[in-house]
């Protein structure tokens, strides 16, 4: 009986610690985003469509108190999985928050059409062989990047908003008409 109680306490402690680190880590490692988020985002809600898997997800992954819903984060990981291999990885919450902040700054409406979230190393290597746009050490492989567009919103406008936030990588691909966001150092291309 004592072992079962200890195991339950350890599991609860682990879940609480992970959520706390995610929330605290956001404030420590992304102070600009955390300040902007406090002003702009009452709660974390996103609406996704994966163009490769034909799946949709509308999810509230963080409440107005800043607490993450671990089940919702799992759902986000699933829809942002590697469409080539089906491999699911843990997406960095910072890239999710970056997407949320950009979407809310644009008015908060509109389904985010995902072209690429997580990429397995196998799929990324294939893309590197096929294209000059893919890079060997992509943040997609780390679960720290998303390529997307929002129907009805010009990618140029999304880029402008993302650049004003001065957080992470912001890539604009005018020929393919999509945006890349990541949670690496601030840079643009």
How should these model regions be labeled?
Residues 102-106, 110, 122, 152, ...:
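Sec/Tat-exported extracytoplasmic proteins
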Residues 1-8:
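N-terminal secretory signal peptides
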Residues 111-125:
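Acidic helix-start/capping segments at beta-turn-to-alpha-helix junctions
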């Amino acid at each position: 009986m004592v072992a079962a109680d200890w195991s339950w306490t350890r599991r609860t402690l682990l879940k609480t610690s992970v959520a706390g680190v995610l929330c605290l880590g956001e404030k420590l490692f992304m102070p600009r985003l955390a300040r902007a988020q406090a002003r702009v985002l009452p709660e974390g809600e996103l609406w996704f469509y994966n163009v490769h898997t034909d799946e949709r997800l509308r999810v509230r992954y963080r409440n107005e108190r800043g607490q993450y819903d671990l089940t919702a984060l799992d759902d986000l990981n699933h829809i942002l999985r590697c469409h080539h291999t089906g491999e699911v990885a843990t997406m960095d919450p910072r890239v999710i928050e970056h997407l949320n902040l950009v979407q809310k700054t644009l008015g908060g409406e509109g389904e985010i059409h995902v072209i690429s979230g997580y990429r397995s190393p196998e799929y990324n290597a294939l893309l590197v062989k096929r294209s000059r746009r893919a890079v060997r050490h992509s943040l997609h492989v780390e679960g720290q990047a998303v390529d997307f567009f929002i129907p009805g919103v010009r990618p140029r406008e999304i880029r402008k908003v993302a650049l004003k936030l001065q957080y992470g990588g912001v890539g604009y691909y005018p020929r393919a008409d999509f945006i890349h966001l990541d949670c690496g150092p601030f840079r643009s291309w």
